[in-house]
Amino acid sequence: MAKRSGVEIRDLDAVRDMPAIRRIWREIGWASDKRAEKQIPVFYKAGSCSVAAFDDEAECAVHAIPGQMQFDKTLLPLCVIAAVTTSRIGRGISLAQRLTARELAKARQRGDAVAVLGMFDQGFYNKVGFGTGAYVNEFALDPASLDVAIKPRTPSRLTTDNSDQMLASLLARPPLHGGVTINIPSLYKAELSMPSDGFGLGYFQGETLTHFIWMDGDAEHGPYKLRWMGYRDGAELLELLALLKSLADQVYSVRLIEPPHIQLQSLLKRPFRQQAIAGKGKFYADQNAYAWYQLRVLDVSQCVACIHHRGPALRFQLAVSDPVDEILAGDDLWSPLGGTYVVELSENSSARLVEKGDECPDLPTVCCTVNTLSRLLFGVSPATSLAITDGLEGPGPVLQALDTIIRANPNPGWDF
């Protein structure tokens, strides 16, 4: 890894480093106005942050916050890499890579089982063990095309002063595999406060906000961007979609990520016709599937224990390699994750790291990187597919059995 003399790697000092952090955000275009810049210190009050400094001036920072991730029926402790920022003079010398690895090590020491991040593009974070997440669907649609027959009630207007209630509504959504939650009220309010044109509409039951939408966009006819949608059940979700449809008198286009509990296309009137007519321009109609996030396992045993298989037990050896083992070699923060595990998938699944020389030669062996293992365990892609695309190696019958055992289609349902 390339190094630069005089680089100090340390924890963030909020008082000393904040002017430099603000400067970096301006340089990379994340703080477009004073309103957004005002929220920067709020973000860094939560979680953990590592910085790389030249002459005591921070030039790169990696910020991690705690969360939870649903693995089938189990909630796992989660590390969210929330911000990776590098100044104009700090690029090309692997600072972000080193700091990200450092935050992963700290998260692993805290007991986090998995880490996630939103990627600016695919490839960079693979160097620290991340694998690409599952596809999500993004829609641009005319709200009038929503095929929802119910008539919504008159909603209440919401502002950032309702942020705690909105967060509680998000946390009350039905759990789903791969679902992420980040319960940090100050951080959520700061995020809502950054765009100057954000607004919310929602419904109360007494003092409780039961379901809501939060959007931004100040043009007369849109397009609006739907940022957050909280609900407790399907009936409330349908009312929110009906509420969105009611805006069609004035709003021509809304962009949104598909709500994770439904297939939105089935609730659109003639979607292909809409896309053909409005395929280009400001108010286009479109549907795209892509993976915007990545994930990586931090604790193999914790993750494997979440798999509950009622059929015949599947036992095999798992040989894993992890690039962070080399990046942080000799660092007391990190104990190697790579090695050989004896894995059993059953009603009480387990993965046990074995010492060299204690391997079980009678068991079939599956070999992969931690990047591929992360995609495998969370069901991003089946084992037989990963054998084609990601270098997963193992006997065909074992890979086919993994295809049927591991739950598929994780969906974070949360922007991070």
Task: Please state what every model-predicted region is.
Residues Q109-A113, M119-N137, H261-K280:
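Conserved active-site alpha-helix within GNAT-family acetyltransferase domains
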Residues R315-L377:
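C-terminal hydrophobic structural anchor segments
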Residues T86, R91-A105, G234-K245:
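Conserved acetyl-CoA-binding loop-helix of GNAT-fold acetyltransferases
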Residues M1-P66, K73-V80, L146-S186, E220-R227:
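Short amphipathic alpha-helix that is part of the acyltransferase structural core
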Residues L353-F416:
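C-terminal interaction segments
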Residues Y135-R227, Y231-L238, A242-L247, Y252-E258, ...:
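Amide-forming acyltransferase catalytic core, primarily the GNAT-like/NAT-type
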Residues I81-R91, F120, K225-G234, T372:
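A short, internal acetyl-CoA/4′-phosphopantetheine-binding micro-motif in the GNAT/acyltransferase core
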